[in-house]
Design a protein with these regions (language model features):
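Extended hydrophobic packing segments that form well-structured cores
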Residues: 362-397
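Metal-dependent enolase-superfamily TIM-barrel catalytic cores that perform enediolate-based chemistry
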Residues: 152-245
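N-terminal secretory signal peptides and thylakoid transit peptides that target proteins
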Residues: 1-19
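Shared catalytic-loop signature of beta/alpha-barrel
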Residues: 84, 88, 93, 100, ...
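Glycine-rich, aromatic-flanked loop segments that form ligand/cofactor-binding clefts
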Residues: 126-161
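Metal- or metallocofactor-binding catalytic centers and their adjacent structured scaffolds
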Residues: 62-137, 395
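C-terminal segment of N-terminal export signals and the immediately downstream linker at the start
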Residues: 22-53, 57-59, 66
Length: 397
């Protein structure tokens, strides 16, 4: 069979193109190198790093890439012990298989599945896995979640958004004096933020329904963005009763864990806003699933957060990629953890908006030496919160 009539120039050109394709698809294509690393990377160590009432979780790998997450809302010594034990489930696993590892830890023990100790620890592990994966690909975590849905993130508290706490506990029925005092505090808050600012009232589960219903009617003229934690988590019937009698939007979710505890609020249509906490509900992985569920019911997220800059930044990554979002709780004054422990790379502007966190990964630098100083400070150690009524009986916290 005769060979096709191809010029020498065409042959050289095609050979050069083949060589170029091979180079681009190989060593000079950073994506290929990253893909190779994500295939061979393994978890080699998981270390709890206590710091006052918080515990940081450090996950190390055989490629020298390290991720960090934060445990909050647990007794630190117990949390640290559980994380140390859970390493057995994570050893030699690929940290980029985030969903697989989430399921492995969550389902590992039938008697701990869904409980606060396991889910809070899993939340920190999940943050650290996303941190590692973002660092491997050299991008902020929100890029891995589908990219940002907004250019900046509205936050509170700040000069443009004020949250008034209930300051309880309160007995079953409030007196006119107690109601008037709460109304006065809310009126003062409205003055602080002005007519364009956001005003939030946190009932903190310490206001019984009769007081809350009275109060909601009295503060309606102050344009409240939402009432937070109006009932003990999971008490759907009370939420339904309050939803029928209160015109201000109701919000809850900070102490509910995973999609399975959030779903009843949506199905019963007894709240207007969901407040998942990235450190309570199962980490970034669960935050994105909760956001998708809530979006189907047209319920926006206003995530709760009382974590340091590490956990807070994880939450910011999640909401950056969440379409239906209202506002993020974000404490930036350093009272939760000294600012030198976890150094962030985002700022809140004069209008109360946080810039998008930059990567790679979470984009937070952890100073383990500074964290150790917090752990050694007797004034910053964990104390069990016990709230009592005037008669000595135990109140909800």
């Amino acid at each position: 069979m005769p060979l096709p009539n191809v010029s020498r120039r065409a042959l050289l050109a095609s050979a050069g193109l083949a060589m170029l394709t091979e180079v681009v698809s190989g060593q000079e294509n950073p994506g290929v190198a990253v893909a190779d690393r994500t295939t061979s990377i393994k978890i080699t160590r998981v270390t709890p790093l206590p710091g006052g009432s918080k515990v940081y979780v450090k996950i190390e790998t055989n490629h020298g890439v390290t991720g960090y997450g934060e445990i909050t809302g647990l007794e630190p010594k117990v949390a640290a012990a559980l994380v140390t034990s859970v390493f057995e489930l994570l050893k030699d696993e690929n940290p980029t298989r985030i969903e697989h590892l989430w399921q492995k830890v969550y389902r590992s023990h039938r008697d701990m599945r869904g409980g606060p100790f396991m889910v809070h620890c899993l939340s920190a592990i999940d943050m650290a896995l996303w941190d590692i994966t973002g660092k491997l690909w050299g991008v902020p975590v929100y890029r891995l979640l589908g990219g940002p849905c907004r250019d900046k993130i509205r936050c509170y508290p700040n000069a443009k958004a004020y949250k008034q706490a209930a300051g309880g506990p309160y007995p079953f029925a409030g007196t006119p004096k107690e109601i008037a005092a709460l109304v006065e505090r809310i009126a003062d808050g409205r003055k602080k933020v002005g007519p364009e600012g956001a005003m939030i009232f946190d009932a903190h589960c310490c206001l019984p329904p009769p007081i809350l219903i009275q109060l909601a009617g009295a503060i309606q003229p102050y344009d409240i963005l939402f009432l937070e934690e109006v009932a003990v988590p999971g008490n759907i019937e009370v939420f339904k009763r309050l939803k029928e009698q209160i015109r201000i939007p109701l919000a809850t979710g900070e102490r509910d864990r995973t999609i399975w505890e959030m779903l009843p609020y949506l199905q019963e249509r007894c709240i207007d806003i969901l407040q998942p906490d990235c450190g309570h509900t199962g980490g970034i992985s669960q935050m994105r699933k909760i956001a998708a569920l809530a979006e189907a019911y047209h319920v926006p997220l206003a995530p709760h957060c009382t974590m340091s800059f590490l956990g807070l930044t994880a939450s910011l990554h999640a909401v950056a990629a969440t379409p239906l979002f209202l506002i993020q709780e974000a404490y930036t004054d350093g009272h939760i953890m000294p600012s030198g422990v976890a150094r962030k790379n985002w700022e809140v502007d004069a209008d109360g908006y946080a810039s998008l966190p930059q990567g790679p990964g979470l984009g937070v630098e952890v100073d383990e030496g500074e964290l150790a100083k917090v752990a050694a400070d007797p004034k910053k150690q964990y104390r069990w919160p016990v709230l009592k009524h005037k008669d000595g009986s135990i109140a909800d916290y």
